Amino acid sequence: MSEFSQTVPELVAWARKNDFSISLPVDRLSFLLAVATLNGERLDGEMSEGELVDAFRHVSDAFEQTSETIGVRANNAINDMVRQRLLNRFTSEQAEGNAIYRLTPLGIGITDYYIRQREFSTLRLSMQLSIVAGELKRAADAAAEGGDEFHWHRNVYAPLKYSVAEIFDSIDLTQRIMDEQQQQVKDDIAQLLNKDWRAAISSCELLLSETSGTLRELQDTLEAAGDKLQANLLRIQDATMTHDDLHFVDRLVFDLQSKLDRIISWGQQSIDLWIGYDRHVHKFIRTAIDMDKNRVFAQRLRQSVQTYFDDPWALTYTNADRLLDMRDEEMALRDDEVTGELPPDLEYEEFNEIREQLAAIIEEQLAIYKTRQTPLDLGLVVREYLAQYPRARHFDVARIVIDQAVRLGVAQADFTGLPAKWQPINDYGAKVQAHVIDKY
C-alpha cells in the first residue's frame, strides 16, 4: 500500500540522477541467491569477502566455468553488486583489506522473491490474516473511543498504514506469485504432452490437482477472514464520518477496502480460470486417447494384413437376423419390410389415389360448415378426423384437412395479429395452431 508523494517527472529525474540500474545475468543472479542462502544461516547477517568468494566458487563450478581466474571474476562480481546497491560494503582501519558485506533491502527483496516467496503456506497466510484481524480490531476499538489528532495517528492510522497495509501487500504478492506458478505449470504440462502424452497423463493430473488445491486453500482462507476484516474497516469508516479533519484515515480505509476486495475477487477469478484450463487439458487428453486408439487399431490391422502369409489369421463376424414386427396394427408402418419396396410409379399412384379419395370426402363434409355459416374450429375437426385413421396416416390426413379447410374461408382473428393457441390433435403430441374460421 505504497503512497508516492513525488510526481512521475520527479521520480524519473531522481532515478536518472542516482544512475539506478540492475543487470543480473543468470550466473550473477545465482551468485546473489547463494549469498542470501548462506547469509540466512548466519546469526549476525554479515559475510566476509572470503565467504563471498567461496560462494562464487560454488556458482562457477555449477556453470562449469574456469577456475584459473576465479579470484578476479569474484572480485568483479562483488564490486558490480555493490555498485548496483545489492550489497553494502563496510571497511575499518583496524581490519584493512578485510571488508564486511551485508545485503541491502533491494538485494533482500530480489532474493526473497526467488527463495522464500516461492513456497505457498496456508499456515503462513493464516498467521498473516490473524495478525491483520488483531490489528484491525484494535484500530476499530481505538476509532470508536475517539480522541485527539495524536490518538488517531498513533492508534488508528499507524497500525493501518504500517502493519495492515504491508500484510495486504504481502498477500497480494503471494497471489501474483501463484499467477506465475500457474503459468509455469501450464508450460510444464505442455512440454509433458508434447513428449509422450501417455506417460505424462499421471504427471499432468498431479500438477493440475496440486495447483487447484493450492488455489482453493488460498481462497478459502481469504474468504473465511474477509468478512471480519471488512466489518472492522467499516467500523473505522463509520467513526471517521463525524470528523472533518480525518480525511487521511478515511482515504486509507478506502484503499484497504479496495485492496481486500481486489484480493478476494482475483482469488475467485483465478480459480475459475484454472478450472477452465483444467477442463481444456482433460478434453485434449480424451481427444488424444480417442485418436490414438483408432490409430493403433488401424496400424495393427495394416500390420496383420502385411504379415498374413507369415502369420495367417481368420476373421469371424456375426450378423443378427432382422426382427420384423408382424402385428396387424403396425402393418402400415412396416409395409416396406414385409412386402418389399414398391416401384416409384406404383407408390406415387397409390398415394395420389388415396389422397384424392380423402380430399373428396373431406371437402364434401367440410362444405356443411360453409352452407350453414357455422364457425370451423380446425383443431377439433382435425382431431375428429385423425381418430378415424391409424397413426401412420395422421400427417397426410391432417395436411389434407387443413388444405381443404383454408379453401373455405378465413379467420377474422388472423387480422388482429394475435397468435392462436396450440391445440392437440392426437394422443401422440401433435398440435396445430389456427384461429376459428368464421368468414367464408
From Swiss-Prot:
Protein's GO biological process: cell division; chromosome condensation; chromosome segregation; DNA replication
Classification via InterPro entries: Chromosome_partition_MukF (IPR005582), MukF_C (IPR033441), MukF_C_sf (IPR038198), MukF_M (IPR033440), MukF_M_sp (IPR036141), MukF_WHTH (IPR033439), WH-like_DNA-bd_sf (IPR036388), WH_DNA-bd_sf (IPR036390)
Region listing for Leucine-zipper, in residue ranges: 208-236
GO CC terms, sorted: cytoplasm; nucleoid
Keyword entries, A-Z: Calcium, Cell cycle, Cell division, Chromosome partition, Cytoplasm, DNA condensation
Localization, UniProt: Cytoplasm, Nucleoid
Source domain of life: Bacteria
Main location: cytoplasm
Aminoacyl-tRNA synthetase keyword on record: no
One Gene Ontology MF term: calcium ion binding
Transmembrane spans: none
SUPFAM superfamilies linked: MukF C-terminal domain-like, Winged helix' DNA-binding domain
Quaternary structure, from the entry: Interacts, and probably forms a ternary complex, with MukE and MukB via its C-terminal region. The complex formation is stimulated by calcium or magnesium. It is required for an interaction between MukE and MukB.
Role played: Involved in chromosome condensation, segregation and cell cycle progression. May participate in facilitating chromosome segregation by condensation DNA from both sides of a centrally located replisome during cell division. Not required for mini-F plasmid partitioning. Probably acts via its interaction with MukB and MukE. Overexpression results in anucleate cells. It has a calcium binding activity.
NCBIfam families noted in UniProt: PRK05260.1
Family note: Belongs to the MukF family.
Protein name in UniProt: Chromosome partition protein MukF
Source species: Salmonella paratyphi B (strain ATCC BAA-1250 / SPB7)
Gene name, Swiss-Prot/TrEMBL: mukF
